[in-house]
A protein has these predicted regions:
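Bacterial N-terminal signal peptides that target proteins for export
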Residues: 1-7
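N-terminal signal peptide c-region/cleavage motif recognized by signal peptidases
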Residues: 17-19
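Conserved active-site regions of diverse hydrolases
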Residues: 22-394, 407-413
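Short beta-strand segments
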Residues: 28, 78, 117-121, 176, ...
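Short beta-strand segments enriched in hydrophobic/aromatic residues
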Residues: 33, 62, 355, 407, ...
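Extracellular/periplasm-exposed beta-strand and loop segments of Gram-negative cell-envelope proteins
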Residues: 126-133, 142-150, 186-191, 257-261, ...
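Outer membrane beta-barrel transmembrane domains
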Residues: 354, 445, 467-474, 564-671
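Outer membrane beta-barrel translocator domains of Type V secretion systems
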Residues: 366-530, 535-536, 650-664, 668
Length: 671
């Protein structure tokens, strides 16, 4: 019961953002880690009757639909026992044959906007070790370098990824393999070897159960040394119980040797595979499940796991035979493993969270340019208020000093993939203008900005920076007016925080970077005189902006830390609307409504990857709304002959409940 509650809570959190629909399809190639039942329940290695594999959770998250095995018409081609090399029985497709089967159903082409998983290699390692021992070929087993020398299996796994990319696959997730020495099987490896050698003459199940019972009574693990000591203690207790008084030192040496060999070989396989993948071209999403499991096993409680030594199903019982109500099924605690190799339902849910965090991260990072957009918008909004003030209060040979505050606030309702959460920015503005004549004014302005952005429940950052502009404005007696401004800004984006939910743990990755922007605005209008104090007329505008956000690296050494490329964007926006203004009154209100249209609406693109890999992939962010409407209400007032004040409130609507408000308040003093 306890495990079911933890599993349900994890699913609720992950699937709360399932409206993403970021991909058109989801296809999985692999072995029993991913097999959803291509041969019925006997190939579904997962404890419990209603549990979900990591890929079934991801399918609901990204496509909002169940994930069905390929033999039943779906896109899960993974088969239990599968390998990259031709090592399994002929009835089990290799990863390459699974891809061939998939392509044969899809006219030989992969989906350019599809998300693929190729998770293969664990069975290759098992076959390779057994075959090497049978042949007395220990060269690859004893090799202590970084590369895998036992067989070409890592290269064949890479070839499977390449085959999908060559067929047009958009994104390929390539998880590595958790250390075999950390699985429950390692604790009973000696008994497993005896069972293989002696068959029915050796009652392995008795030893498995005794080992399972001994390990279940151990406490929390805080180090690898402690984990090994628990296993050695349990191993020694079982041997003593069965009249085999082998010295503890011998047991320790054996256990350490087996664990080290398994872990080293797994690490070599992962290294060779990653090295091969780094030479490919395409969107490869490397998922470091090896390091993730290292972190979980040494801090199980933090992630919500009560036991990382024994599985849900008693050691020696395969998980597809282990369902609720069976004597060998345990739901008293939350376990990391279903059986002696495969993850538990909670383990699969955590893997899904982990993979989703990697896939989504560059997409979230595309939102960083919003700070530049807001800085430009609040700066320009204040400048427009000053230019309106100058039009309302013309003069000759006046030197004007002006300043004040401006800011913006936005709160949008949607899922985390909309990238439109809460945004606030506040600016301090100061400027200088020269009024050469009633018809001509020019000057400059500088703004210091402070912003706070919560893009969604997983991504947030702060911004601090400055923007400076030069402007010129001309007004004619017949009511025509026009102005132009050019601006340059720079920002420090600090406290970039990306939250990753992993079971019960919330991990936060931190980073920081810089951003720069350049822009030009052109505005013109005509004021038709309705009365001595009221004018009205059309307004038109054009705005060009160019943004750049530098690349950055998250600063932890964890399995989730990533690095991201720089991002650039150009925007061209035309606008048209209508203005009603008052003049020569103690307080001169004005109203303006505008329609804005993006001529170029390309979205930001960002490449990213885990810090420990040379592979990378690129995600494109959300396209800006093609059209938006703004409504401005403002006023200017002459307090004295030399002192004027002005203020505006500007409401922007972009659809999808995405609304923003800009405000300005300033004063102008003439000398």
């Amino acid at each position: 019961m306890k495990g079911n509650l933890a599993y349900s809570a994890t699913l609720v959190f992950l699937l709360s953002g399932f409206n993403a629909f970021a991909f058109d399809s989801f296809i999985v190639i692999g072995d029993s880690m991913s097999d959803g039942g291509n041969r019925g329940n006997d190939s579904r290695y997962l404890a419990g009757s209603h549990s979900k594999l990591y890929n079934e959770i991801l399918s609901e998250y990204y496509l909002n639909k169940p994930f069905i095995p390929s033999n039943f018409g779906g896109d899960n081609y993974a088969e239990g026992g599968a390998t990259a090399d031709k090592l399994s029985p002929a009835s089990i497709r290799t990863s390459e044959q699974q891809i061939d089967f998939y392509l044969s159903r899809n006219n030989g082409r992969a989906d350019k906007n599809g998300l693929y998983v190729v998770w293969i290699g664990a069975n290759d390692i098992s076959y390779n070790i057994v075959n090497s021992v049978k042949k007395l070929d220990f060269h690859g087993l004893l090799h202590k370098g970084e590369d895998y020398l036992i067989s070409p299996s890592p290269d064949l796994a890479v070839a499977s990824v390449k085959k999908l990319l060559d067929a047009g696959a958009g994104y390929v997730i390539a998880p590595n393999i958790p250390k075999a020495g950390l699985s429950p099987w390692t604790s009973v490896s000696l008994f497993s070897f005896a069972e293989d050698a002696l068959g029915d003459k050796f009652n392995a199940q008795k030893f498995y159960k005794q080992m399972n019972d001994e390990l279940k009574n151990k406490g929390e693990i805080s180090s690898e040394k402690q984990r090994r000591e628990y296993i050695v203690d349990a191993f020694k207790a079982v041997l003593d119980k069965n009249g085999l008084p082998i010295p503890r030192s011998v047991v320790n040496v054996y256990q350490q040797l087996v664990t080290d060999v398994e872990n080293r070989i797994t690490g070599q396989f992962n290294h060779s595979m990653e090295k091969g993948l780094s030479k490919l071209h395409g969107n490869i999403i490397w998922a470091d499940v090896e390091t993730l499991f290292d972190e979980i096993i040494l801090s199980g409680k933090e992630y919500g796991f009560d036991d990382v030594l024994v599985p849900v199903c008693q050691i020696g019982v395969r998980s597809f035979h282990c369902k609720e109500g069976a004597e060998t099924y345990h739901d008293d605690k939350v376990y990391l493993f279903s059986d002696w190799f495969h993850p538990s339902p909670e383990g699969h849910a955590l893997i899904a969270q982990y993979i989703a965090s990697i896939v989504d991260a560059p997409y979230f990072a595309t939102s960083l340019s919003k700070s530049l957009e807001n800085l430009n918008a609040t700066h320009q909004s204040f400048l427009d208020g000053q230019l309106q003030n100058l039009r309302n209060n013309p003069g000759n040979n006046k030197l004007n000093v002006f300043g004040g505050f401006s800011g913006s606030a936005k709160s949008a309702q949607g899922n985390r993939m909309d990238l439109s959460g809460r945004e606030t920015a506040n600016d301090l503005n100061v400027g200088l203008s020269v009024q050469e004549s009633p018809a001509l004014a020019y000057g400059g302005m500088i703004s210091a900005s402070d912003g706070d952005y919560k893009v969604n429940d997983q991504y947030r950052y702060d911004s601090r920076g400055m923007v400076a502009s030069l402007f010129i404005q001309s007004s004619a007696d017949n009511g025509l007016w026009g102005n132009m401004s050019a601006r340059f800004g720079s920002l420090s984006l600090d406290n970039i925080k990306r939250d990753i939910q992993l079971g019960k743990a919330t991990r936060t990755e931190n980073g920081k970077t810089n951003a720069t922007g350049f822009g030009v605005s052109l505005n013109a209008g005509y004021n038709y005189k309705l009365t001595d104090n009221i004018t009205t007329g059309p307004v038109i505008g054009y705005q060009y902006d160019k943004y750049k956000v530098d690349g950055f690296r998250e600063n932890s050494g964890s399995s989730t830390a990533m690095h991201f490329s720089s991002q650039k964007q150009e925007r061209h926006v035309v606008s048209g609307g209508w203005n009603i203004s008052t003049h020569s009154l103690p307080v001169n209100p004005y109203f303006e409504i505008k329609y804005h249209h993006h001529l170029q609406d390309d979205a930001m693109s960002v490449s990213g990857a885990l810090n420990g890999t040379e592979t990378s992939f690129t995600r494109t962010g959300k396209k800006p709304e093609k059209n938006r409407t703004s409504v401005k209400l403002g006023a200017t007032a002459a307090l004295t002959d030399d002192l004027n004040v002005f203020g505006t409130i500007n409401y922007n609507h972009e659809g999808n409940n995405n609304n923003a408000i800009n405000y300005t308040f300033g004063a102008n003093y003439s000398f």
